[in-house]
Amino acid sequence: MRLLGKISVSTALGLAAAAVAQTAAAADPLKVGLVSFYSGPVSGPVGIPSRNGADIIIEAINNGALPAPYSGKGVGGRLIEPIYVDEAVEAVNEYRNLVQRQGVDAVIGYASSGSCVGIAPIAEELKKLTLFYYCGTTRTFEEGEKQYVFRTMNSQDVENIAAARYTLSVKPNLKTVAGMNQNYGWGQESWRDFIKSVQKLKPDVQVVSEQFPKLFAGQYGAEVTALARANADVIHSSFWGGDLDALILQAAPRGLLKKSTGVLTTGGTALNSLAKQIPDGTVIGVRGTGGALAPASKFNDWFRAAYQKKFGEEPNFPAYYMAQSVLALKAAGDKAAAASKSAPTADDIRKALPGLDFETPAGKVYMDRHKGHQAVTEMAYGTFKLVGGKPTLTNIKRYQPDCVVPPKGSKSLEWIEAGFPGAKCK
């Protein structure tokens, strides 16, 4: 894959152990704001699992109990002091409150792309280390370089390029496509990049319906009727959270996703809760390789076991991705401590993030795009099948970054429209 200036966290962690041991007792805590939807319809599938995932990792970091390759207590010796804030309540104002009144060292958060678009310039203005853990809009880094803002998972362009490739691999004779996406940046960009990718790969595919209900509308009777009449081979949807659940439930009585194959790019959050309503054959994404599509590893086994023990259920992919952001702090902080032989400041951590790679329960993350501020990981999709009453994913395909990630220096839409020059797909 395309990786320039990559710095291995395993090397840094070995050097950091002694420095961490020396600084752990005396270092001030690292105050971290952790923001997601902890109330409302998004809280169940996204916000609460995200918080739970962070809890598991923070507890292990503070106790020095993370699996290899990590070692030592804290972030370069600084224990994490979490402050949880609900994204549902005036996200921009609450961000300012975290920074200016509560004095956090860093902020991890934001599920909604709308939140991230609003907060990114404020983070730069206030010069506060901010890690976006879930929002996917490409605007964050394509509309100007950032110094203080990072994203520790893929952006939506990568998800939808991979979705297009997967869809055509399972439906090579695809003729017609419809879209059901929320009417704001995330939904508009997701549909744009998916359909442009599909049509670049198979130019004869026709769009027969495009539906853009407002975010968190909740009721989709008119849109479901329109999609049923269109009778497309495939319906693409980037709905997430409570909107995704509502769509699945309202589509079920009409058999919409049985007649037309659903391509649900965030469908992994509904696997367990709505398994009986999701038709076999539905294409399921997890926005990377978290949750049900996490690769086998000792780290993943540890995370799943710890999560199940504490919360009594399987971790879904939002739990993985907030955990991933916390691990980015740990990896960068330990690297900075190894270099300075002292507890890292937030600015030390910020400077250690570009070019870093680090291990997570969802696999390796490379801080490689947009001058090291945008993460790169592999992407995975699978096909839903209910087996013995249990949800399973079959025909799983994994896409390496060289196949689905735009090259450095290129904008995603331009790369798609040019026909993915330089892509290396197996």
Report the location of each language-model feature:
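Solvent-exposed, acidic/polar segments of extracytosolic/periplasmic ligand-binding ectodomains
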Residues: 30, 357-426
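Beta-alpha junction/loop-to-helix N-cap segments that form part of ligand/metal-binding clefts
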Residues: 45-49, 64-143, 152, 213-220, ...
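Extracellular/periplasmic periplasmic-binding protein-like sensory domains
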Residues: 251-324, 334-340, 393-425
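Bacterial N-terminal signal peptides
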Residues: 8-19
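Sec/Tat signal peptide C-region and signal peptidase I cleavage site
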Residues: 19-26
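Extracytoplasmic ligand/sensor domains, especially the bilobed periplasmic-binding protein
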Residues: 52, 104-210, 259-284
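Short, polar/charged alpha-helical segment
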Residues: 45-72, 192-200
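Extracytoplasmic "Venus flytrap"
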Residues: 33-57, 85-89, 111, 180-189, ...
